[in-house]
Amino acid sequence: MKFRGKVARYISEILEEGKTLHFSLFDPDKIFDLDSLHDIASKLIEAGTDVFLIGGTLGISQDKLDNILSILEEFSIPLIIFPSNVNLISNKADAILFLSLLNSDDLYYIVGAQIVAAPIIKRIGLEVLPTAYLIIGHGGTAGHIGRARVIPYDNIELIVSYSLAANYMGMKYIYLEAGSGASETVKPEAIKVVKNTVKDGVVIVGGGVTSEERARNLVLAGADIIVTGNVIERDHQKALKIIKEIKSIRRTSNAIK
């Protein structure tokens, strides 16, 4: 909880330096060996990751979530919860992505879960990062569970319209999600147009970031934050190379202040 109340500023300061942030996503349901988590986290820190993001869609218990956060809080970067439902909240984290799945057909994922979660978040004092969550292309488990009307990869106009609507509703962060295990990322062209249209928004991109080249293309398109999760689980060495690639590129887009 070292960063509670300071996470948004932490993100802004890194962006102001002309750098893209990397978030390492840990899915508690896919962590089978808690003893190795500390070692993996150490290597991710050394490679340059900026935040540990903790979340998943299925099979998450409160005890396991808290145990993972207890291990990760030893490190000097923020811990942010990436919730799939109201059960994924913990006072051991610094902040929470307060998500609204804007392209869901189910009001529960647009505003219902948020109404239930808000008093809990207020009571435990988590820093809130208001985030529009848009599921694009592949969608994956999150798209299925969240009953998303998935936006096609190549429908850039629709992606931009959703992003602009989110910005007008006061959401600071726009998360463009291709889905866990996606065969491709959100198109760099879409990211570029979103960044040029929503100039004061922080654009988060996740899903399909499986190579250094893909990561580089996202950075050059203007992504503010890049999330990797599956590649960390499957191939630590490749994940480390991707992080180093992201952190090696100097951004040319305007930093968010």
Swiss-Prot record:
Its cofactor is Mg(2+). It catalyses: sn-glycerol 1-phosphate + (2E,6E,10E)-geranylgeranyl diphosphate = sn-3-O-(geranylgeranyl)glycerol 1-phosphate + diphosphate. Mg(2+) binds at D27, T57. GO terms for biological process: glycerophospholipid biosynthetic process. Pathway: Membrane lipid metabolism; glycerophospholipid metabolism. The keyword Cytoplasm applies. Its EC number is 2.5.1.41. GO terms for molecular function: magnesium ion binding; phosphoglycerol geranylgeranyltransferase activity. The keyword Lipid metabolism applies. Sn-glycerol 1-phosphate binds at Y175, L176, E177, A178, G179, S180, G181, G207, G208, G229, N230. Keywords: Cytoplasm, Lipid biosynthesis, Lipid metabolism, Magnesium, Metal-binding, Phospholipid biosynthesis, Phospholipid metabolism, Transferase. It is found in: Cytoplasm. NCBIfam families: GGGP, GGGP-family, PRK04169.1-2, PRK04169.1-6. Belongs to the GGGP/HepGP synthase family. Group II subfamily. Prenyltransferase that catalyzes the transfer of the geranylgeranyl moiety of geranylgeranyl diphosphate (GGPP) to the C3 hydroxyl of sn-glycerol-1-phosphate (G1P). This reaction is the first ether-bond-formation step in the biosynthesis of archaeal membrane lipids. This is Geranylgeranylglyceryl phosphate synthase. The lineage of its organism: Archaea, Thermoproteota, Thermoprotei, Sulfolobales, Sulfolobaceae.
